[in-house]
Amino acid sequence: MTRGNEKEEAPPQAKILGSFPTGIAPYAELMRVHRLLGFYLNTSPYLVGVAFCASISPTKIPITVLLHRTILLSIWSIFLRSAGCVWDDLIDMDLDSQISRTRTRPLPRGAVSPKNAFLLTVTLFACGGSVLIYLPWPCAVDCLIITFFALLYPFGKRFTDYPQITLVNIGWAIPMAMHSLGLDPLSQMKPTVCMFLFIGLVIIMIDVIYSRQDTEEDLKVGVKSMAVRFRESIELLSYSLLYASTGFLAMAGFFTGLGLSFFVVSVGGHFCGFWVLLKATRVGNSYGVESYAKSAFFLATLFWLFGFVIEYCLRN
């Protein structure tokens, strides 16, 4: 997903990477510890999922329980994201070596061996999965589903123009958050599906915008993606994803009977925040994309959370 598209133009120079010992820095770079956008994209769906559950639960969920689940799910998402980055680079090593923005990554430049990268992937997934012992058993099934699609993602760009579709699985954070709090997604099927699709479409939208930076080189190498497939109509695609995601978020609020504050703060904040992102990046320019995306996604997450938190407070 966005994990696979967090490109680097030079060997690790970021201050955060410089704080690691020389032998560890390439592994930290491989895990993208210095690229915050990926952490935002993978962690915020779980935060939103917990807030969503709190606002629709028929009984009040204690704040201590909400904080406990938030911490555990955040830990899981951080390890998931890091493992996904390593796995993507391992599978894409031959392609990354042919693209200027990625050929300086640890694997193409030989700073990390494929064997060590594989072992790191397994270790990270295992560490993330360890939090499941503190969560209800249905979360283990959710974990397996999310992990399966995370492993599948890097293969998609070799065989289909729509590898970003697998990123919809990040929206599975919603049912996982519900299971962690003892709520049954099937009893709230319509809003759960809407929230799932909302998260998935937002992730796809950002990934498409980010992937656009390398469209020309991807065409030469043979990398497939929606950014390549719709390179002549990338603006139409991006705005369509924005409108669709806004619609699904609004429908989730409608099906659960959320109030005006949710629609003004969460839905309105989401639309305005990403509309500004699309305008600022002009939907195809590479300059400043990551910086704009980080700011827009961070602010949008705050709007999503504030709307749900207000509803939680009003209902309780």
From Swiss-Prot:
One Pfam family from the record: UbiA
Compartment(s) of residence: Membrane
Catalytic class of the enzyme: transferase
Gene3D superfamilies: UbiA prenyltransferase
EC number: 2.5.1.-
Cofactor(s) the protein requires to work: Mg(2+)
Predominant localisation class: membrane
Record keywords: Magnesium, Membrane, Transferase, Transmembrane, Transmembrane helix
Record's catalysed reaction(s): 3,5-dimethylorsellinate + (2E,6E)-farnesyl diphosphate = (3R)-3-farnesyl-6-hydroxy-2,3,5-trimethyl-4-oxocyclohexa-1,5-diene-1-carboxylate + diphosphate + H(+)
Membrane topology type: Multi-pass membrane protein
GO biological process: terpenoid biosynthetic process; ubiquinone biosynthetic process
Pathway(s): Secondary metabolite biosynthesis; terpenoid biosynthesis
Phenotype reported upon loss of the gene: Drastically reduces the production of andrastin A.
Transmembrane segments: 36-56, 60-80, 131-151, 163-183, 191-211, 247-267, 294-314
GO molecular function terms attached to this record: 4-hydroxybenzoate polyprenyltransferase activity
Entry GO CC: mitochondrial inner membrane
Its biological purpose: Prenytransferase; part of the gene cluster that mediates the biosynthesis of andrastins, meroterpenoid compounds that exhibit inhibitory activity against ras farnesyltransferase, suggesting that they could be promising leads for antitumor agents. The first step of the pathway is the synthesis of 3,5-dimethylorsellinic acid (DMOA) by the polyketide synthase adrD via condensation of one acetyl-CoA starter unit with 3 malonyl-CoA units and 2 methylations. DMAO is then converted to farnesyl-DMAO by the prenyltransferase adrG.
Family: Belongs to the UbiA prenyltransferase family.
Protein name according to UniProt: Prenytransferase adrG
Species of origin: Penicillium roqueforti
Lineage: Eukaryota, Fungi, Dikarya, Ascomycota, Pezizomycotina
